[in-house]
Amino acid sequence: MMKTNVAEILKSGTTLQEVIIKGWVRTFRSNRFIALNDGSTINNIQCVIDFENTPEDTLKRITTGAAIAIKGTLAESQGKGQSVEIQVSKIEILGDSNPDEYPIQPKKHSFEFLRENAHLRVRTNTFSAVMRVRSKLSFAVHKYFQDNGFNYVNTPIVTGSDAEGAGEMFRVTSFEDNKAPVTEDGKIDYSKDFFGKETNLTVSGQLEAEAYAMALGKVYTFGPTFRAENSNTTRHLAEFWMIEPEVAFMDLDGNMDLAEDFIKSVLTYVLDHCKEDLAFLDARLTQEEKTKPQLQRSDMSLLEKLKFVAENNFKRVSYTEAIDILRNSKPNKKKKFQYPINEWGADLQSEHERFLVEKHFKCPVILFDYPADIKAFYMRLNEDGKTVRAMDVLFPGIGEMVGGAQREERYDVLVAKMKAMNIDEKELWWYLDLRKFGTAVHSGFGLGFERLVQFTTGMGNIRDVIPFPRTPQNADF
């Protein structure tokens, strides 16, 4: 007798074989037909019980959400939609589910309702599909870097530096409320705190990854990061995962090559290994698009978007060229953009990025050589003195997906930039050391994993692609 899962049974199509399977009841019809799901696939398997010979007490306990164990024989299914079913010889109730209290009923629930029940929402088709895709994407990330000679580095979550220079950080302290010691000028004295200095949750592992790239050559981080940005939008989370490779002796051109190859590789992997889940999510998104006003509908289905990125060469365009294109575009001239493009130096918005990808070039785009004034201190200054070796990868439907740069490897230039941006050299003494001892050209990029999952699954809200979202005023579960 074989202990197996639903995915294996449906894939094999074998009949006349005895199996034992455990899972959760999705539906129970006519006191006879159980739709059972064990999480291995989006599909349920029909289990047909012998109503006359099943105790009434057992029948009453077969409710939506109940955990059960089934023993039976695989048979050719008489119903539509699946090749096999299980003719049940024995059923055991492993865990009851009170139908009057169980929130996830066999009907359509709003995403807002499901966020309030995040501990149970993965039992729905949509969220189980999203989380299986997330799992495969995560594996594909590690597989790509490991197959290409990268070392995985675990960078610290508690840090004393702000890699982005934005200041939107969660403070870490051991001081009790209203009992923090203060200095003579009334400020909190962090020298007496646990770490002896002011510390925060990390916003990026990039700086530490640079240190390891300057010894191991090719490294990547893949871990949680935190932003105390008070943004209640469909694109922001306070806790999310970042993918950040860093490579020694690689310039911006190599960095753009790496980003394009990486993205194509992980999307191709998911297209090959998540066909059923992506087909379901594609159909879901198609129905959702029909409810939108015509002008807001996407021209591409989910699968078309994924193949659009995975199969097209990325167009490389300088920021300056992009500004000229946008400034002379019809939407800009007719004032259709929410943020008009009037001059060089403007920080591009999602609407501009999407126009370049979806309307102008009709392929993924990599913008490079941005104005220094709108980018971080660690990006390498170009010879013109006003642009930096930064790059952003732009996707359809979402805009920026990847942000990266060739790092400033020249000690004197980096110090000057830090002073100009009022960044304390003492806080980053170790980062400056990397430019004093064996400095070299090096580059890397950052990619928010949840944003990649959101693009891959077609979910409209980033809170729906992470198991337990952390957002302003929300840290349940």
Q: Which role does the model predict for each range below?
A:
Residues 134, 252-260:
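Short, charged, low-complexity patches
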Residues 24, 140-148, 204-207, 211, ...:
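Generic, well-ordered alpha-helical scaffold segments in large soluble proteins
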Residues 249-253, 272-274:
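Inter-helical turn/loop segments and adjacent helix faces that build the functional surface
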Residues 196, 200, 214-224, 237-251, ...:
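TRNA-recognition modules of translation machinery and tRNA-sensing kinases, especially anticodon-binding
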Residues 163-169, 174-189, 261-393, 420-440:
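Metal-assisted phosphate- and nucleotidyl-transfer catalytic regions
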